Amino acid sequence: MSGIERRPSPSNPKLSEVTIPAGVVLFSEGDRADAMYIVQQGEINIAINQGSHTLATLEKGASFGEQAVVGTKYRMATATANTDAVCLEIPADWLGRQISTAPPLLKTVFSALTLQLLQRNYIASIAHSDAGAGEFVIESGGPAEHAWSNFSRGSTLNSVYCSDGGAIQNQLQSGRALIVSSGKLELRRGSARCALGEGAVLGLAEVLAGVPFDDAVDVLSSVNAWAVDGDAAYALVFKLNKGLYGVVKGFVGRVLGDGKSLGRLAQTPQ
């Protein structure tokens, strides 16, 4: 992290402002996660596959790194300053304390959003490879297993049965996201095709934001899944303090992708 400087934040001396020169890496994919960040000045690139594929370019007000802090504990992407940049650094222990006192449904949402982001990153890597198809697998000891363990251990959600893609689309169009507990499906995004099984997350970021689910889904073997009511989850999120609301908003923005509408999450609670 050569060239990176830290100093107390003028607005909150308990936190640090981090200055990152253009081209310098703040953290790399696979690093242990000990903080999240909010861009104050400049631009930050978020990339996967050892920095070879850029997922997003973040500007002032955007948050990043929260997914690893609350979900996987290890960085899922590489953050590099696209220009000279200044970021507010928020330690993992602060975020952990905020989440530990939050309602159980919020903890469930964080774990499931982490899985959805890992899934999105994997599909993005397929789309930019020669293969064009792959299978998202929850690997033992990996970040997805950590998030799945947290989700399945604490879940008290209702379960639904879907025999085909139409049944899944009906759930999503009714504002319910699905987290697969058994069965198998194929998700198609553009030219990329991805097989998914246990731990697949469909539409959570979308129902929180109140925006359409754009991917096509085929059921390969009948699916049982937990359902998350988007309106109920959003109502809970909207009552959070501004800091945690911003974390959820940033999370959803990463999952939906650069340039996509944040829908009702674009508004800020008073």
Where are these regions (language model features)?
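Cytosolic regulatory regions built on CNB/CRP/Popeye-like sensor folds
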Residues: 1-270
